[in-house]
Regions:
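WD40 beta-propeller blade core
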Residues: 37-38, 77, 121-123, 171-172, ...
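Catalytic lobes of large eukaryotic enzymes
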Residues: 234-237, 271-272, 315-318, 326, ...
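Blade-level signature of beta-propeller repeat domains, shared across WD40, Kelch, NHL, RCC1
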Residues: 235-271
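A short beta-strand motif characteristic of beta-propeller blades
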Residues: 1-2, 45-50, 85, 90-96, ...
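Conserved beta-strand element within WD40/beta-propeller blades
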Residues: 27-30, 67-71, 112-116, 161-165, ...
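Active-site surface patch of divalent metal-dependent phosphodiester/phosphate bond hydrolases
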Residues: 311, 315-430, 441
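Canonical WD40 repeat/beta-propeller blade segments in eukaryotic WD-repeat proteins
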Residues: 4-19, 54-61, 93-109, 140-155, ...
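Short loop/turn segments that connect beta-strands within beta-propeller blades
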Residues: 41-44, 81-84, 126-128, 175-178, ...
């Protein structure tokens, strides 16, 4: 349709019509010059134009048979229905003033909620006077929340309005008494868009990630998350009319990458996948697989030191560990700090000379890893039952991280598609002193993924650790299905939740081990040690950062993982060669830094 080059459309709304058959045939367009254009979509004609505002029309709202237009100066114009039963650009209007600085607004029935930064005000545009128009005398706001960026309502919770904030929080207000029903911390990233879809709340982030939340439970449950766009998601729109027109519920996302994408609002594939997993025992045969996973921050110790008298307890530890396991099918050894990460010379070399590595230094590090591989091989030969031969499946290393996996010889021929990768998290993802080694394999028709992690250190770095594990789990370290041209595993049902195997969470069974570095919050060292001596572990676990994040943070990626009950004393941090907690100058408080977590969709 022809238009002037200077015309910039800044807002749009479908015009109410007199009959249902005419619905969706006409639109109003607000422009940067303050004009409103009425367009006949069917005939592609400009019906009317009116200079309704002096400033840019930033929003157009629809309520019943009325339309409301808001400009950037804060002028709100009310277009009531005419004798024809629908609003007209020719009729007389009412206007009100609202504060400038609009960051978000949403029409909820006869109410208009307008946010300016952190403040939210509620108005009644159909009012006849200024007193009736301003519903609240003072704005709504909550301490420690960022600016409002987005908002939505959910049909199953129609009494509430949900607002997204720049700091990843969602505030919830009651539409009847305007009380704050809660503030939920769902992410550390900026929420750029919200939409109510059925019973769920969809959220778009400045990272391009989309999340679907079930808000009916406490804490909220993440039903699904995925990378919807390469850049920020600026809008999410549910299209309920598609239910009767196309027999599906469509959700449209628009990103600043100039891409518009359409998603299944019913999450049908996920629903089917869940139902199928519930019935898989009816159609599949299963064999139990015993996997022994050990995680150890070895503090740069060498295998040769383990044999020395003052380290005999460590030597016995490995012997006792293997004997206690019986005869597992898979043995996973995950080490952290096989190189001294506190040696600034070593870590600086590995970073600054990453392009031109020192051969001598690399040889030293490689020798350390080989020494441990050979030592573990000898331990297995010495301590595991003689009638079960084990073979080395894979080893991997990355600046102190070392993974060594053995499997029974009888199992090796059934294992296909062994792929490995690494995810660096040190120095903003550039350095491997923190991060993860990941291994994927397909055993018969099941996919397994093992992660050996070392996350950010520091008592106060919970958010940093949460970001580390999120980045690791959101990475795409593996080749996608089909795994090879001549693959005997060509079907995609070896992966979970419709995944193609490129991501860690696509695998049916995931096991994380490592020095996750989560500490005990708001409790001094002496108090922690006192509770340890009294065996009052439940009191300490109440303040465990990992467990707290799982309880309070719906977006915490480890919520999808389970963990065996913790019945042992904190594993961090001991004086070298002793059972005494750290008495160095730093005097670090004990904590359960070393963890093993698993996700098995009912199979672990």
């Amino acid at each position: 349709m022809a238009h002037s080059e200077n015309m910039k459309v800044t807002s749009i709304v479908f015009k109410p019509t007199a009959t249902v058959e005419e619905e969706g045939t006409q639109i109003w367009l607000g422009t940067s010059s303050g004009e409103i254009h009425e367009i006949d979509i069917i005939n592609q004609q400009l019906l009317k134009t009116k200079s309704a505002h002096r400033r840019e029309v930033i929003k157009l709202f629809r309520y019943a048979s009325e339309l409301w237009s808001l400009d950037e100066s804060g002028e709100l114009v009310i277009w009531k229905k005419s004798s024809s039963g629908m609003p007209s650009l020719d009729q007389q209007t009412n206007s009100f003033r609202v504060p400038r600085g609009h960051t978000f607004s949403i029409a909820c029935g006869e109410q208009l909620w307008i946010a300016t930064g952190k403040d939210i005000r509620v108005f009644k545009p159909s009012a006849r006077s200024d007193e009736e128009f301003q519903v609240l005398r003072s704005p709504l706001n909550q301490l420690n929340t960022g600016d409002v960026t987005s908002g939505a309502t959910i049909s199953s919770h129609s009494d509430f309005v949900y607002f997204g904030h720049t700091d990843g929080k969602v505030s919830i207000y009651n539409r009847r008494d305007f009380s704050c029903a809660g503030v939920i911390n769902v992410s550390v990233y900026k929420i750029s868009s919200l939409a109510g879809v059925g019973d769920y709340l969809w959220a778009g982030y400045n990272t391009g990630m989309a999340y679907v939340y079930d808000t009916s439970c406490t804490p909220w449950k993440v039903k699904k998350d995925w990378r919807a766009h390469e850049k920020q998601i600026c809008s999410i729109l549910a299209e309920p009319s598609a239910v009767w027109n196309l027999n599906r519920l469509q959700v449209i996302t628009l990103g600043t990458d100039n891409m518009l994408r359409i998603w299944d609002g019913m999450l049908e594939e996920d629903w089917l996948d869940t139902r199928m997993h519930e019935r898989d025992s009816d159609f599949c045969s299963f064999r139990e697989l015993k996997v022994a996973v050990m995680t150890w921050n070895a503090g740069a110790v060498k295998p040769s030191h383990v044999h020395q008298q003052y380290m005999s307890q460590d030597n016995n530890f490995l012997r006792d560990y293997m004997v206690d396991q019986g005869s597992p099918d898979v043995l996973v050894f995950g080490f952290q700090e096989l190189v001294d990460l506190e040696n600034k010379k070593v870590t600086a070399k590995s970073f600054f000379k990453s392009k031109k590595k020192d051969p001598a230094e690399q040889e030293h590090m490689s020798h350390q890893y080989r020494a441990w591989r050979d030592y573990l091989t000898r331990c297995i030969e010495d301590f595991m039952p003689a009638d079960n031969k084990y073979v080395l499946l894979h080893t991997a290393s990355m600046v102190g991280l070392f993974t060594c996996i053995f499997v029974k010889g009888s199992l090796r021929s059934r294992i296909k598609h062994v792929h490995t990768s690494e995810v660096k998290r040190g120095m903003g993802g550039l350095h491997g002193n923190k991060g993860a080694l990941v291994l994927r394999m397909v055993l018969d028709d099941s996919s397994l993924c093992f992660l050996n992690c070392h996350l950010a250190a520091g008592q106060t770095q919970t958010i940093h650790r949460n970001n580390d594990i999120a980045a690791i789990l959101e990475a795409e370290p593996f080749p996608a299905n089909p795994l090879s041209q001549d693959s005997s595993v060509a079907h995609t049902d070896i992966f979970a939740s419709g995944g193609d195997g490129s991501m860690i969470m696509d695998h049916e069974i995931c096991i994380i081990n490592g020095d996750l570095n989560y500490r005990i919050d708001t409790m001094g060292r002496d108090t922690v040690i006192k509770h340890v001596k009294e065996n009052n572990l439940p009191r300490l676990l109440e303040r465990d950062q990992l467990l707290l994040s799982r309880k309070k943070n719906p977006g915490f990626r480890l919520r999808a993982f389970a963990e065996a009950p913790i019945t042992f004393a904190p594993t961090y941090k001991y004086n070298v060669n002793t059972d005494d907690y750290d008495t160095s100058e730093k005097k670090r408080a004990p904590a359960w830094c070393d963890r093993v977590l698993y996700r098995g969709l009912g199979k672990v």
